[in-house]
Amino acid sequence: MRGTARRIGGTALATVVLSAGLAACTDGKGESARSCTGGTYAWSDVRRSEELTELADPIRLEKRTASYSAHLRPVGDTGVRPTVNGTPHGVRAADVIKALGKHLRVGEPLADPSDRDVPEEGLGHVFEAATGDLKGAYYSWAYRKAVEADFAYTCGSNAPVKGHVRTWEETGTGFLPCSSGPSELMTGRQAARESCPEGSEATEAS
């Protein structure tokens, strides 16, 4: 019902070499426009957060049912794409994000600028549950596990270029009964407080 979390370790500051060969530099219009690829990244201030992106209206099933579909409406800062501020000249934003993923040793690629956290602007996912025995109060939500970091890119004789990356490692959805204990996910507990009846087990402090 929800995505598989990945635990990723990494030091606060590290250098990733993108190419074993010499950096390739091309003169542009002056030193400030000098293009250089194959440089190194020094990463710092890596931060992770879990963010609620979509939430279903409170779900109340008076009679037992075999399946249920919940429309998730976007909440908070959604419809966003990964961003890179301060992209080095001659380097794509996707390459910077890929370098961050290499530094973090992620199992799956980080989201790149072509990805978005909801299907379309203003529209959410539809979550379907088919357990065969649904009754009572439920809650459903979607989340993203965001990651952001500062970097300094050094290449050839160019001055270091400093920038900032914001992307995400994972997105997922959940559907749980309000009568169960609190969700393992912070966003699940937040969703339960928004959707479940007061006093439900799912809203208790974990």
Regions found by a protein language model. Give the residues of each.
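Secretory targeting and sorting signals
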Residues: 1-28
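Hydrophobic alpha-helical membrane segments, chiefly transmembrane helices and signal peptide h-regions
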Residues: 14-23, 95-107, 142-146
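Core pore-forming/fusogenic effector modules of secreted, proteolytically activated toxins
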Residues: 26-76, 114-206
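Membrane-inserting effector segments that mediate pore formation, membrane fusion
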Residues: 70-123
